[in-house]
Swiss-Prot record:
The lineage of its organism: Bacteria, Pseudomonadati, Campylobacterota, Epsilonproteobacteria, Campylobacterales. Its cofactor is Mg(2+). This is Hydroxyethylthiazole kinase. Pathway: Cofactor biosynthesis; thiamine diphosphate biosynthesis; 4-methyl-5-(2-phosphoethyl)-thiazole from 5-(2-hydroxyethyl)-4-methylthiazole: step 1/1. Disulfide bonds: none annotated. Keywords: ATP-binding, Kinase, Magnesium, Metal-binding, Nucleotide-binding, Thiamine biosynthesis, Transferase.
Length: 260
C-alpha cells in the first residue's frame, strides 16, 4: 500500500499554504508519515526545490507576495520535474483568485489540482453552487472533473461528500468519510498537502490520489466514531482525526469505484 511506503520514505513536502491552516497542515503531514516544510520566502525557493520531494500551493490567504512566491516556486520545481499540487481556494468567489489560479495553471508544471465542485467547475466555465450543480451543459461532478483533467493536463481531485479523481480518461469515485470534515478549518488544505506527499513517491498518480482520498475518508470516519463515543464534537474530532491519520488505516467505510 502507498501509505506504508510513505511512512518508510517520509517524503519532504514544501508547503506554500494559508496562515489559517499552516499548523494543522504541518501536524497532519507528520501524522500521516510525511515531513512538512513550511516556507513562503521567495529568495529560498530555488534551494528548497532541490531538497523537497513535492510542492503544495494553497491560495487561501491570497496576497501579492504569496502570488509571487508561488510563481517563483513553480518555476524551480518545474525545472526539476517535481510534483506540484495546486489548491485554488475560493477561485469561484473572486476575480483575483480565479485569475491567479488560471495564471498558475497556465505556467505549466502543475501535476494535480485539488478543490471542491464550485472551484473546479469555475476553472472550466461550469457554474456549480454549494447545494448542487446549476449548469445546463454538465449535470454531474464526473463531467466537471474530467474536463478539468483534460484541459489542464493534471490529475484532478474533487473533494466533497463523494470524492472524484480523474486523469482525463478514467474517473474514480470515493465514498465514505465524515460530515465533521466540513466543520473544521484546514481539512481541505491538509488534503492538498497529503496529495503532494503521495505524488512525491512517484507511483501511479491516479491510483495514488484515489488511495489517498479513501484513506482520508476512512481516517475521518474513524475519528468521528471515536469522538461520538466520547460525547465529543468538532473540537475532539479534530484531535482524533490527527490520531487516526497516524494509525494503521484499514479501508472499511471508504469505497473506490470506477465510474467512467
Amino acid at each position: 500500500m502507498v501509505l506504508k511506503e510513505l511512512r518508510q520514505k517520509r517524503p519532504l513536502v514544501h508547503n506554500i499554504t494559508n496562515y489559517v491552516a499552516a499548523q494543522f497542515v504541518a501536524n497532519g503531514l507528520l501524522a500521516l508519515g510525511a515531513s512538512p516544510l513550511m516556507s513562503d520566502a521567495i529568495d529560498e525557493m530555488q534551494d528548497l526545490a532541490k531538497i523537497s520531494d513535492a510542492l503544495a500551493i494553497n491560495i487561501g490567504t491570497i496576497n501579492e507576495r504569496a502570488i509571487l512566491c508561488a510563481k517563483e516556486a513553480i518555476k524551480h520545481y518545474k525545472a526539476l520535474n517535481k510534483p506540484i499540487v495546486l489548491d485554488p481556494v475560493g477561485c469561484s468567489a473572486s476575480a483575483l483568485r480565479h485569475d491567479t489560479s488560471l495564471e498558475l495553471l497556465k505556467s505549466g508544471g502543475i501535476s494535480a489540482l485539488r478543490g471542491n465542485a464550485a472551484e473546479l467547475g469555475s476553472l472550466v466555465g461550469i457554474s456549480c453552487e454549494s447545494k448542487g450543480l446549476d449548469s445546463q451543459d454538465a449535470n454531474t461532478p464526473v463531467e466537471i472533473i474530467k474536463r478539468v483533467a483534460q484541459k489542464y493536463f493534471v490529475i484532478a481531485v474533487m473533494t466533497g461528500k463523494t470524492d472524484y479523481v480523474s486523469d482525463g480518461k478514467k474517473v474514480l469515485s470515493i465514498t465514505g468519510g465524515s460530515e465533521y470534515l466540513a466543520l473544521i478549518t484546514g481539512a481541505g488544505c491538509l488534503h492538498t498537502a497529503a496529495c503532494a506527499s503521495f505524488l512525491g513517491l512517484k507511483k501511479d498518480p491516479l491510483d495514488s490520489m484515489a488511495q489517498l482520498c479513501a484513506l482520508y475518508k476512512q481516517a475521518s470516519f474513524n475519528a468521528q466514531k471515536k469522538a461520538l463515543e466520547n460525547n465529543g464534537s468538532n473540537g475532539s474530532f479534530l484531535f482524533y482525526f490527527l490520531d487516526a491519520l497516524s494509525l494503521p488505516i484499514k479501508l472499511e467505510n471508504s469505497l473506490i469505484k470506477e465510474v467512467l
